[in-house]
Amino acid sequence: MFEKRPLTKDEDINWLGIRWQPTMRCNFNCFFCLQHQYKHHSDAIEKQILNDSLDKIDRAFASGKLKWWKIIGGEFTILPLSIRDRILEIAKKYDPYLYLTTNGSNLKNWLGPFTENDVHGELLISLHDTETDIFKTIEEGQKFASSHPNFYVRYAIVAKDNLDTVIKAHDILGELLIVQACREEYTNKITDEYKASPEYKWIVEHNWGNSYNNKYYSNLRTDDFECTMRGIVIDYNGRIRLCNRSKDEDFTIEEALNELPRSVTCSRQECTKCNGQIFKNIYTEINAFERLMNMKKRK
């Protein structure tokens, strides 16, 4: 339910990620969330858990420890109205920069919670290249953007099966975040197609929670390549930096890993059994990427 990034000395860039799951089950154990203390998930307990967690978040904003608020995963709009109203109340009171995500089918639910200027932030709309109503979703997103000028609206698409749809969506929007374009032949098609369109900004991002594929790195050929993994960003030149630090500040692999909140572990079955294997996997992936970049430099 909640994911807390490590706090930094610079209060202006402190932020809290809130991960809502449709089942209200928690993916992370952190001090903002009490859900891991309960084994049952009755409606009453879940509501109390949410209220207790929001009390902690309220106090954190009041103390100045947090400035940004990111709601990710699941659907904010399926929460009980009293909880949703409480979140909006906190957001309006402390005016943090609010990051929101939604899938296309639930986009219409976002038109209600916010008035034109009451909060500001960013809305990421997730699409899939096999959706039948993908262009209707894009149209609804553009309506939201025009009626909510304080929100920057972006789009992300799972690009796996229908290249023509991806290209058409990109032509409409001019900017599109590509997520999980992992099939080798498909990734090559995307990068080859848009080598001729340098005016478009393409970012290829691979979510840290999914399975990694070393071939994925070696087949991406775009100048704007970034890979985000649990607070670590590796840019196309092989430079390692942290999401919650200045882009101009470089880190070694060891320094970056030391900055990760090691006590925050994924509760999915394949992760809890491995006793921290998720962090070892991240280390392996960074190593593989570093070796790849060294090979490119030698060439």
Pin down the residues of each PLM region:
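Flexible mid-to-C-terminal extensions adjoining Fe-S/redox cofactors in radical SAM and related proteins
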Residues: 1-16, 36, 239-299
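Canonical Radical SAM [4Fe-4S] cluster-binding loop centered on the CxxxCxxC motif
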Residues: 6-52, 244
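Short loop/turn segments at strand-loop or loop-helix junctions that form parts
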Residues: 21-24, 29-36, 74, 126-129, ...
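Short catalytic/ligand-binding loop motif for oxyanion handling, primarily in non-cytosolic enzymes
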Residues: 29, 39-42, 78-80, 108-109, ...
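Glycine-rich phosphate-binding "P-loop"
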Residues: 42, 72-73
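Radical SAM/AdoMet-radical enzyme domain recognition
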Residues: 53-72, 79-180
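A C-terminal junction/extension of Radical SAM enzymes
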Residues: 164-250, 297
